[in-house]
Amino acid sequence: FGLVCATCEQIADSQHRSHRQMVTTTNPLIRHENRMVLASTTAKAMEQMAGSSEQAAEAMEVASQARQMVQAMRTIGTHPSSSAGLKNDLLENLQAYQKRMGVQMQRFK
């Protein structure tokens, strides 16, 4: 359990760093790409952590939804503003999952 917590902290810290860089970037295309990368890394992290819990199937489902959204956006070649919606969808999915798990991640707020 401690290892999972440490992994979560590490992921959250690296996401905070990339988020700070993303916020300071004014180019909308770069921000759009960063949001998609952030969604992908979050999905990957969830899949890695899911291996050690009984709610693994649910975590995998949320992660694969995020992956599919990013893949669809890359395929279609979406407008930069649409990735803001991706971020909100991903956060909603994560928060719903955490409520069911009884976990609150304060860092995402």
Curated annotation (Swiss-Prot):
GO terms for molecular function: RNA binding; structural constituent of virion. Its main location: virion. GO terms for cellular component: host cell nucleus; membrane; virion membrane. It is found in: Virion membrane; Host nucleus. The keyword RNA-binding applies. It is a multi-pass membrane protein. Residues 22-109 are annotated as: RNP-binding. Pfam families: Flu_M1_C (PF08289). SMART domains: Flu_M1_C. InterPro entries: Flu_matrix_M1_C, Flu_matrix_M1_N_sub2. Keywords: Host nucleus, Membrane, RNA-binding, Viral matrix protein, Virion. It comes from the Viruses. Homodimer and homomultimer. Interacts with NEP. Binds ribonucleocapsid by both interacting with genomic RNA and NP protein. May interact with HA and NA. Cannot bind NP without genomic RNA. Most abundant protein in virion. When expressed alone can form virus-like particles in transfected cells. Belongs to the influenza viruses Matrix protein M1 family. Plays critical roles in virus replication, from virus entry and uncoating to assembly and budding of the virus particle. M1 binding to ribonucleocapsids (RNPs) in nucleus seems to inhibit viral transcription. Interaction of viral NEP with M1-RNP is thought to promote nuclear export of the complex, which is targeted to the virion assembly site at the apical plasma membrane in polarized epithelial cells. Interactions with NA and HA may bring M1, a non-raft-associated protein, into lipid rafts. Forms a continuous shell on the inner side of the lipid bilayer in virion, where it binds the RNP. Determines the virion's shape: spherical or filamentous. Clinical isolates of influenza are characterized by the presence of significant proportion of filamentous virions, whereas after multiple passage on eggs or cell culture, virions have only spherical morphology. Filamentous virions are thought to be important to infect neighboring cells, and spherical virions more suited to spread through aerosol between hosts organisms. This is Matrix protein 1. It comes from Influenza A virus (strain A/Camel/Mongolia/1982 H1N1).
